[in-house]
Amino acid sequence: AARELSLPRPARDVTFVIDTSGSMKGTSIEQAKKALIMALDRLGPNDRFRIIRFAGGYSDLTPMPVPAETKMVERAKAYVRGLTAEGGTEIVNAVTAALAGVHDVNPTDDGRTRLRQVVLVTDGAVGDEDRLLSLINGRIGDARLFTVGIGSAPNGFLMTRAAAAGRGTYTFIQSA
């Protein structure tokens, strides 16, 4: 009889970057918040996370990844529920901060080798696509960038190219 091999899931440092610009108003921001809360619920006990929101500027819940302990995850979910959509779309600075933060953290500082991931949640309605793509190409290092397209017509072309540059995948969340 064949025995099932169960490998331990590697610990992850996940930085979620969420678009809260004006183009995300209405259903899009609600979808993005729901997706982010689902992702937070799927973090494992050895994972760490960080959330960066961006519109005209960017801000983060914590400056570095924090352990995915129940208390921190609940605090993050409350933060996400309170996000609103307004303002411009300055994506480059937010992604710069995410990639810098990913590489500032020692991936083995708790004795574990960690997968470093950036998850970009946006409708892709940005003006500086070329700068974004060259930033990802230049700074991704050994991290991976995944894109999640939100809204009725996300910029799938940009999202696919950004995910490819980050050696990740693009997922489109269809409007209900």
Question: Where are the regions a protein language model picked out?
Answer:
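Exposed acidic/Ser/Thr-rich ligand/metal-binding surfaces
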Residues: 1-176
